[in-house]
Structure formats: structure tokens, C-alpha cells
Amino acid sequence: MKKSRPQSPLIRRLLYFWLPLAALLLGMGYLSQIRYNPAKEAKAGLDRLNHWRTQAGLQPLAPNAQLQKAAQNHANYLSRHPEGHDETQRSHPSYTGADPQTRAAAAGYSAGVAENLTISNFARSGRTSTDSLMTALYHRLALLTPTHNEAGAAWVRGKYNAFVVEQGSSQERELCAQASQLAQNRSRYLLTLLCNGERTSIPLNELPPEHLAPVKFPIGNNIDPSYDGKENPNPMPTRNPVGNPVSIAFYGNQAPITLHRFTLRSSHGEIANPTILTAASDPNHQLQTNEFALFAPKPLDYNTEYTAQFVYSQNGKQHTETWTFRTRKKRHWFE
């Protein structure tokens, strides 16, 4: 009788350890991709955004059916064609317009919108998607628009995973709905809004109230310590992973801001050699005149309290804004 050749230690390790481990990891990866419920993830993403807006002292975003429809259509489209904010494939069943304003109008939303989104090859939860957007400077500033008070979100898993948030102002929506009627009036002010994708002048006796308090972020607790460099366009295109950007923005019709000093410190001292972005130094020319950001040269420490200080002049007077935040704890030992 022919005897079989004994297996080598390498073959035994491959058969009894590495192959089962690989099968287990693949199975876990597969299950992690199918466990998501799109409606629940969309709601979780919007809830997470409202959590961050509340920590920043802003009003939460109420669900709006038209904005949700616009977000759903675009997320459906992105799950097949990952083109960002543009749509070029008119034959796609969910195509409703080339740009966010056209798509919002097609969904029945008359006012201007801000659209933010993530696209990935693998499914990410709505909460994780929102947290990622909040570390991306340009997206964050739009998500924290203080006059916005309604939104719609959608999460879709197709060839690609897409998460989309559309947000707007109920006050502007109502003014757009009355634009034709108000156009007959003789009024003191003329307010220009984006209505149904077109610039529209609306006569008003009184202008809507403006949010004049600066919006600061991060603020509060459980803050991600880093920015991964994946925002498009990238505000830090030549750097390795850096600190979660610290931003301050002044909204409304305000006098220009002159920056004197922007610092970030912890109990270990002031962060050295930060990158300060302003409208003048922003490599992508995305920042507005009264928007400012500070990037630490490397990720911030976990579970650490930081204090940001922004010293500036406005209308000939010097002011100081100071706020604190604490980074989150490590989630696992790989971090």
C-alpha cells in the first residue's frame, strides 16, 4: 500500500490556520456590507449631523420630503455613476438634473440648497459618513450653515455606496413660493435668492434676521482627531494625515474680519507650525472672506482637551473668540 507523504509545517499552517482565517474575514466583510438598512442609515446620518450642529450652537435640521426626494434621486444615481455633484448620464432612471439646484427644483423644492455627499467602494454607516464629512473643511462649512433648518438624506448601496445630504432654509423656500406675488410690491429692500435654480429678486419691507454669531468647530466632546486628506478638492494637498481642522466662520452681511492670531493648545502646550487657511491662502479658493481654518501638522492626540483661540479685528475693534473641545478615545488598538 502506498503511503502518503507527510505534510510540511508550512502546508499545515496554511490549511488549518490561514485559510480558515481568510474565510472568516471574508465572511465578516460580506456580512458587514449587507447588514445595513438604507432608510435607517440615512436617518442616522442626518441625526448625527444634527448632533454636531447642536454642539456648535445651531438649530437642528427638520426632515423635508422634497429635499429627501432630491437626495434619494442623486444617491441612486451615484450608486452607479460616482460623479460627485454633477450628473451627465441622462439615461439613468434617477437622473433629474445636472446640478444640485436643478435636481432640488425637480423634486419640488423651490429654494437654494447645499449638497454634501460621500462615495465609497465599500458600505459605510450613515453616522460614519457624516463624521467623515465633518472632518472635511469645505463640506463642514456648508453643513454648518446657520440659516438652514431643513434637510433630506439618503443612503444607497449599489455598485458604489453613496450618502447624500441636501439642506436648505424654510424661510427662503416660503419666500420663493411667494416671489411672483411679492414682485408686485414696492418695498424698501430687494432680496436676491436662488429660486427654482434661477436668481430671483424679491421686494421686502424687512430683511430676514441674520445669524451674526461666529460658528466654531470642533466644539464639545468625542471629536475625531485627524483629517485623512480625502476631501475633493483637498485643502491640504501636499501633506500626510493632519489634525482635524479647527474652523471659525462669520455669516451674514458683516464687516470684513482681520485675523491677528489663531492658535490651538493642549495641556502639553501650543501646537507648533500649524497651517492657517484664509480666503487669500486657500489653495482651492473655496473659503469665503470671513472663513478661517487651522490645521495641526499631525493628528491630534486621543482623549485630549484642546483650546482654540481666534484673535481678530472688526470695525476697528479687537475681539477674541475662545472655545474648547475634547477628542474621542481610541476605538481599538489598531488606531
Regions found by a protein language model. Give the residues of each.
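Acidic, low-complexity Ser/Thr/Gly/Pro-rich repeat segments typical of extracellular/periplasmic
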Residues: 226-229, 233-335
